[in-house]
């Protein structure tokens, strides 16, 4: 047997260079590159291996471990899970910073390979710098926290363990049914230890992502269910994008006259203008999709996890005869809502159903309902685009909270811009193939409802974990995946302040991204939630501490985000009017470096809900009558929802 004597870290790098995926006959490298932040826990081990021979891996320098791992996830998401980035950090705080990103990737079923440094396997120098000592178990380190948020976790305590660990890692990373974060912990001493690795460990490995076919029995059951139903509705989930099944879904909708709503992950699989595309569905959905969904007698979920935002906490579907048909590559997700399961690739399942349903000449019973619903939403959308603030007699979209305070925000932020009007203008002015990236706050709701996707795969929303701080890093990841396209991070001031470190990496790599920063001086989405459930405004506006009350109810904070970003070398713009916004967007397209447009918008001018409800933990007992009323409303809505 031929062997190669290498360190564990060197063997890992050599192995990663030999991984390929094949999908629909197309073969490509699986691991594009590796994000690094070096510390004592990885620099002389994995760092040495990368310096000596990185192979074809692109080596990137992150600025924050969570940020770089978010960028890696966004890269894989934009690549439809067919290519990934790895990330390496030092031991302790560096690795802990990636835990949130691991959870984000796993919640979204997006493959990311995390390689955190770890404490010494020999324990000789214990406690090593940044080690946590657990007196009940000395084998525990910070990296054990990854177990809860990884789809596969392993620790390499001996060099020879690398082989089985990495083979299992690739199994999970290339498994469309159960992929997510894979964490391989690398004790810092073991990284540098040598072993005689067999040459066959480094052979080219092609991981074929196969399209699972539906069984004849499940297909027959699905046909029997569909032919009994008159008003079905489909839900286009992220699985449609990752399976590249958009054309088949369009064919299915057109052939059988069946409309579909979009989840956050599924949006832009098909252009918004398609006659059967109702748009966003659920809590952050629009009136068209939710109205049709309420009356549907069959819900066909295609590649969706049926989150609470998609089902409106299982209260959206109100037809007493409604049943569920789930097409999913994952048995776990297909099993939800007591559904009839078709465990299969979305494309193959749809093609098979098209053949079977055509044989029986199936057609839904919709007449004008689909067109009427879309027309109603287009009318509402036009209204949202044209909302303008007036100092007197103005009623915001989210009304009754602090309408009387809006003039204070006008003065403090120097703006009269409404969020819906800003989004409308941005949607009009961006290139058709531009990619927008979002994750948290009020923007995901506005964008799922309002954004018109004119080209496929241009809407990139992380809403499985709704991770604040994903947006800027996510934009970098999307840009690395599609460097020829303009990429825009749609981010609120709250999320931007949490994390925007990879904006600097975009400058370093000369990968231009555009940050569209919506500043309403607060956590506006959560302010809406608390006040909508009977509370006052508490801890969600960005106000100075009042020296008299000792509370955060003083003057509104105004931050010049453009000035801050300009210090990095970003091209920046200040926007307080639609005219300035248009000028900034046009000029930003001409730039070759990353840009940031600091857009001051008024709170409460985002969209509100349409025909939906969201179950949150309202206090059952309170001295506040409005909280009591909110709790009673919750109980009433729960009575209309499924129990599971």
Curated annotation (Swiss-Prot):
Its cofactor is Mg(2+); thiamine diphosphate. Its EC number is 3.7.1.22. Binds 1 Mg(2+) ion per subunit. Binds 1 thiamine pyrophosphate per subunit. Mg(2+) binds at residues 493, 520. Keywords: Hydrolase, Magnesium, Metal-binding, NAD, Thiamine pyrophosphate. Involved in the cleavage of the C1-C2 bond of 3D-(3,5/4)-trihydroxycyclohexane-1,2-dione (THcHDO) to yield 5-deoxy-glucuronate (5DG). Thiamine diphosphate binds at residue 65. It catalyses: 3D-3,5/4-trihydroxycyclohexane-1,2-dione + H2O = 5-deoxy-D-glucuronate + H(+). It comes from the Bacteria. The keyword S-adenosyl-L-methionine does not apply. Belongs to the TPP enzyme family. Residues 442-522 are annotated as: Thiamine pyrophosphate binding. It comes from Bacillus cereus (strain AH820). This is 3D-(3,5/4)-trihydroxycyclohexane-1,2-dione hydrolase. Pathway: Polyol metabolism; myo-inositol degradation into acetyl-CoA; acetyl-CoA from myo-inositol: step 3/7. One of its GO terms (molecular function) is thiamine pyrophosphate binding.
């Amino acid at each position: 047997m031929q062997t190669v004597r290498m360190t564990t870290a060197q063997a890992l790098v050599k192995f990663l260079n030999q991984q390929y995926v094949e999908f629909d006959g197309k073969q490509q490298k699986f691991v594009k590159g590796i994000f690094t932040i070096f510390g004592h826990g990885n620099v002389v081990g994995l760092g040495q291996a990368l310096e000596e021979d990185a192979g074809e891996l692109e080596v990137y320098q992150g600025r924050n471990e969570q940020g770089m791992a978010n960028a890696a996830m966004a890269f894989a998401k934009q690549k439809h899970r067919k290519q990934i980035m790895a990330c390496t950090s030092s031991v302790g705080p560096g690795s802990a910073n990636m835990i949130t990103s691991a959870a984000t990737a796993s919640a979204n079923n997006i493959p990311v390979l995390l390689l955190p440094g770890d404490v010494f396997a020999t324990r000789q120098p214990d406690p090593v710098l940044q080690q946590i000592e657990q007196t009940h178990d000395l084998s525990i380190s910070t990296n054990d926290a990854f177990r809860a948020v990884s789809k596969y976790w392993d620790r390499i305590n001996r060099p020879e363990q690398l082989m089985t660990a990495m083979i299992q890692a690739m199994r999970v990373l290339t498994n469309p049914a159960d992929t997510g974060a894979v964490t391989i912990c690398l004790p810092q001493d073991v990284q540098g230890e040598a072993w005689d690795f067999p040459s066959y460990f480094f052979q080219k490995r092609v991981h074929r992502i196969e399209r699972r076919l539906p069984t004849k029995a499940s297909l027959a059951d699905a046909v029997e269910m569909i032919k009994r139903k008159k008003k079905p509705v489909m839900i286009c989930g992220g699985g449609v994008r990752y399976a590249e099944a958009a054309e088949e879904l369009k064919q299915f909708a057109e052939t059988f006259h069946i409309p579909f709503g979009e989840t956050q992950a599924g949006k832009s699989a098909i252009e918004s203008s398609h006659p059967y595309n109702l748009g966003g569905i659920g809590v952050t959905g629009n009136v068209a999709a939710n109205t049709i969904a309420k009356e549907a007698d069959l819900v066909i979920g295609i590649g969706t996890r049926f989150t609470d935002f998609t089902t409106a906490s299982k209260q959206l579907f109100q037809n007493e005869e409604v049943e569920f048909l789930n097409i999913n590559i994952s048995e776990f997700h297909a099993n939800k809502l007591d559904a009839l399961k078709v465990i299969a690739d979305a494309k193959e399942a749809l093609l098979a159903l098209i053949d079977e349903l055509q044989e029986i000449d199936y057609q839904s019973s919709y007449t004008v309902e689909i067109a009427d619903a879309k027309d109603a939403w287009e009318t509402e959308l036009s209204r949202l685009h044209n909302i303008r603030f007036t100092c007197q007699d103005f009623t915001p979209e989210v009304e009754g909270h602090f309408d009387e305070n809006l003039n204070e925000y006008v003065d403090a932020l120097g703006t009269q811009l409404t969020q819906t009007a800003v989004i409308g203008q941005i949607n009009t002015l961006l290139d058709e193939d531009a990619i927008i990236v979002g994750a948290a706050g009020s923007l995901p709701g506005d964008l799922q409802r309002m954004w018109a996707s004119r080209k496929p795969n241009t809407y990139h929303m992380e809403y499985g974990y709704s991770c604040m701080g994903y947006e800027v890093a996510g934009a970098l990841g999307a840009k690395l995946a599609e460097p020829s396209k303009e990429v825009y991070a749609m981010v609120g001031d709250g999320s931007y302040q949490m994390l925007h470190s990879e904006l600097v990496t975009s400058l370093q790599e000369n990968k231009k991204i555009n940050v569209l920063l919506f500043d309403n001086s607060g956590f506006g989405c959560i302010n809406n939630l608390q006040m909508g459930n009977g509370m006052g405004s508490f801890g969600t506006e960005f106000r100075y501490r009042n020296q008299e009350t000792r509370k955060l109810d003083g003057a509104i904070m105004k931050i010049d985000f453009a000035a801050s970003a300009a210090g990095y070398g970003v091209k920046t713009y200040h926007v307080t009017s639609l005219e300035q916004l248009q000028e900034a967007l046009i000029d930003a397209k001409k730039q070759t470096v990353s840009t940031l447009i600091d857009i001051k918008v008024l709170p409460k001018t985002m969209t509100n809900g349409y025909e939906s409800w969201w179950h949150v933990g309202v206090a059952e007992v309170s001295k506040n009558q409005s909280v009591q009323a909110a709790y009673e409303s919750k109980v009433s809505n729960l009575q209309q929802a499924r129990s599971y």
